[in-house]
Regions:
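His/Glu-based metal-binding/catalytic segments typifying zinc-dependent metallopeptidases
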Residues: 1-17, 25, 194-250
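Short, conserved beta-strand segments within well-ordered enzyme catalytic domains
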Residues: 8-12, 31-34, 59-61, 68-70, ...
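Active-site SXXK
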Residues: 25-37
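Generic solvent-exposed, charged/amphipathic alpha-helical segments
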Residues: 32, 180, 184, 239-240, ...
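Charge-rich, well-structured scaffold segments of protease-associated domains
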Residues: 46-198, 209, 227, 257-334
Length: 334
């Protein structure tokens, strides 16, 4: 991308929340914060200052299968960014005295969900549909956070932070050969190790009602779809776009615009390596809940009857536009 002056780095380490130890749900999320609190020869404050000194916009978070470390800066500071990230990944201090504060932050994040009923419903929906560990929430549980120890954290890092399974992507104003040399310089001595994949449990499925005394009501629906790599994957993604691809989509038009049944309604395609699902959400009132559910289910059922040429053209334009716009951003491409 010679037309930009920035560079973005995206590093995925195979240490996602599906690997959280039994009884310690939230371990990966806690670790994503702890590795930023000092690494290599730099303590917590010094590490933050070093990254700020090169204008490194960064983030670290636990995903499903991977822990993601991301950063964007001026292209001339790329090598320094790789240097700092390599220490965060391979030489984190994991200071014991910082763990209580990090655990407290994680617990507060879980407790804050009580004020976000939409999030609570979606978390329960994924757990019910996918089962453990795929359907687990990255935040973990209060019991799991409480059970995390410093020794357990170090063991988790040592076991799951490994080069085999790690993905490093870089985009921006870069030159290939120097980049390869820099990655080799900072990550070349990282030793491989083996780790068994977590065993997926059978999901419960069925219906679940979460009682809460409120005037609002949240509806979540999930049903199986096809994962990336399947011959019908793009057809499934296209179908979701017809349902929920903007203000002209079917759900928005039929549920919200025509009938005024809810303040929010959408559908999305949730994709994992071997399984996938279409998730639907509607936020409405207790008085209009049944009609909202009925109309939403009706629109889902209508998909089997096909879509119009106009809808096909619209979703193609939307998907192409999204891809082209993202190509102009080094962060999005990384």
């Amino acid at each position: 991308m010679p037309h930009v002056r920035s560079a973005a780095v995206n590093i995925l380490v195979p240490s996602g929340y599906v690997n959280d130890p039994a009884g310690m749900a939230g371990m990966a999320n806690v670790l994503s914060e702890m590795i930023q609190r000092g690494a290599g020869k730099l303590g917590n404050k010094e590490l933050s200052l070093a990254m700020d000194a090169i204008g490194l916009d960064r983030n670290c978070s636990a995903g499903t299968n991977h822990l993601r470390i991301w950063g964007a800066t001026l292209a001339r500071n790329l090598e320094r960014s790789l240097d700092l990230f390599s220490d965060i990944i391979q030489k984190p201090m994991l200071p014991k005295d910082e763990l209580p504060a990090v655990k407290q932050l994680s617990a507060q994040e879980i407790l804050s969900l009580e004020d976000e009923p939409r999030q609570k419903v979606l978390i329960a929906l994924k757990q019910r549909h996918f089962g453990s560990p795929l359907g687990n929430d990255r935040r973990g549980t209060l019991e799991g956070i409480k059970a995390i120890t410093h020794e357990g954290l170090k063991k988790f890092w040592k076991k799951h932070f490994r080069p085999n399974g790690t993905i490093i992507s870089v985009a921006g104003n870069i030159e290939w050969k120097p980049l390869v040399d820099q990655v080799e310089k900072y990550f070349g001595k990282w030793k491989q190790s083996e780790c068994a994949a977590p065993k997926q449990q059978k999901p419960e499925g069925g219906y679940l009602h979460l009682a809460k005394d409120t005037q609002q009501l949240q509806i979540g629906i999930a049903y199986p779809s096809v994962p990336f790599g399947h011959k019908d994957y793009y057809s499934a993604v296209g179908a979701v776009n017809v349902l929920s691809g903007g203000m002209s989509s079917r759900l928005f038009t039929e549920v919200r615009e025509k009938r005024g049944l809810c303040y929010s309604v959408w559908a999305s395609h949730q994709n994992f390596k071997e399984v996938a699902a279409i998730l639907c959400y509607a936020g409405t009132t207790t008085q209009q809940a049944q009609q909202t559910l009925d109309v939403t289910l009706s629109e889902l059922a209508k998909l089997s009857k096909g879509i119009k040429e106009e809808e096909v053209r619209r979703l193609k334009v939307g998907m192409k536009s999204s891809m082209l716009i993202s190509e102009e951003s080094s962060s999005a491409r990384a």
